[in-house]
Every structure is written in C-alpha cells, then in structure tokens.
Swiss-Prot record:
Protein name per its UniProtKB record: Uncharacterized protein in fgs 3'region
GO molecular function term, any single one: phosphoglycolate phosphatase activity
Gene3D superfamilies linked to this entry: HAD superfamily/HAD-like, Putative phosphatase, domain 2
Any one Gene Ontology cellular component term annotated for this protein: cytosol
Top-level taxon: Bacteria
Lineage: Bacteria, Bacillati, Bacillota, Bacilli, Lactobacillales
InterPro entries tied to this protein: HAD-like_hydrolase_sf, HAD-like_sf, HAD-SF_hydro_IA, HAD_2, HAD_sf, PGP-like_dom2
Similarity comment: Belongs to the HAD-like hydrolase superfamily. CbbY/CbbZ/Gph/YieH family.
One of the GO biological process terms: DNA repair
C-alpha cells in the first residue's frame, strides 16, 4: 500500500517567501512608499480577503492589483536568474521519501504559471503527482477545497500533509487529513497539527517511518 505525502510549496520546500518580501519592498518603493520586509511579513501564509486587506493597508487599495503583479513578476525574474531559493534539505528529503516508496503530491495556493516556473527551476517537474495549484480551485487556503480535491485524485491509501503555516494546517485539517507542520517565516507552532517538526524538513522521513499509522 503506497502512502502519499502531500506537500505545500512556498515556505515548505522553497524559500520564495523571502524573495517575495524583497519584491514587496521594491514594489512599494516604485510607488514612492517606504516599507520594510517586516511590514510585509503578515502576508506570509495569508490568502484571500485577509491578504487583500493587508496589501490595501500597506500600499492602498487602488495599487493592490499592480503591487501583486509586480511582486510576482519580480520573484519569477529572480528565480529565472538563478536565485538560490530551495530550502536546505528539501531536495534530499524528496529523494529520500521517493526511495522509501512514498508517493509525492503537491497542493499549493500559488497560480499554475508561477508553480510551473518554480518546478522547472528546481528540477521537480516530474517529482509530484498529482499537482494542484490555486488555478485549480475557487477558494484558497485556509479553505480546505484544495485538499478535498486532492483526496479525489488519490487512491484510497493513507495520506499526510506537510505545511509551514497556520493557514495551511487549517486547510488540511478541514479536509480531514493529518498534517505535519514545519513552521515557516513568522509562524509559531500550531498545536492543532498532528505533529510539529521544529528542527528541519530532513526530520520528516524518520518521523514518517516511526509513525506508520499516519502514512
């Protein structure tokens, strides 16, 4: 019986959130606004109305759409230019889990065109199956829709989610899936998670091996 490990992307496997903070500051500067990375840190792990409100408060509602487009394009430019953004141990962990016989899936709120660039840059295009992005659902995390859809694409075998934010943990739990949290930027431990690995993603294979009930 092949168990599936479903990964979030940003902040869990890749440090694009750090790239985004830099791009956010740059976008604000283009608008003539002095903002710091700390100002934009509340955006990490946010989505939907809460994200929109944070952006509107920081750069103005009239500039919100442009701000998001500029920031995303700047991040993609950094990635295409060879920015080092894979989190330490992520690639090794994926290889180890694959060798252990786990099926690897991806569930991210990011748009498909963005995910395609990230996966091409990391060499992970064929690493995950299935892959679900924000372009495949109508509601983003913390809404559990993406994980409900993921469950329909997986055989009736055990599955566990790996997330880095409270928003992601809530989405997985809302779909009835166990979730391991590896806290990301500005994220304290979420004790609603099945487990919290505060040290590193490289601890995940051993944790899974020691907890066969979940995967």
């Amino acid at each position: 019986m092949t168990a599936t490990v479903i990964f979030d992307l940003d902040g869990t496997l890749v440090n694009t959130e750090a790239l985004y903070l830099k791009s956010n500051v740059k976008a604000a500067a283009v608008l003539g606004l002095h903002r710091t990375e700390a100002d934009f840190r509340p955006l990490v792990g946010s989505a939907g109305p809460s994200e929109a409100k944070i952006i509107a408060d920081l750069v103005g509602a009239d500039h919100a759409a442009w701000f998001q487009q500029f920031s995303t394009q700047d991040v993609l430019d950094q990635i295409r230019s060879g920015a080092d953004f894979v989190l330490p141990g992520a690639d090794k962990t994926l290889q180890t889990l694959d060798q252990m016989g786990y099926r690897l899936a991806l569930a991210t709120s990011s748009a498909k065109h963005y995910v395609d660039v990230v996966l091409a840059a990391t060499g992970w295009v064929k690493r995950f199956d299935p892959i679900l992005t924000g372009s495949d659902v109508t509601a983003h995390k913390p809404d559990p829709e993406i994980y409900h859809v993921m469950k329909t694409k997986l055989p009736e075998t055990p599955a566990i989610v790996v997330e880095d934010t409270h928003v992601g943990v809530a989405a997985a739990e809302g779909a009835g899936l166990p979730v391991v949290m590896i806290p990301g930027i500005g994220q304290g431990p979420d004790h609603k998670a099945t487990a919290i690995l505060a040290a590193a993603i490289t601890d995940l294979p051993d944790w899974l091996q020691n907890h066969p009930t979940f995967a």
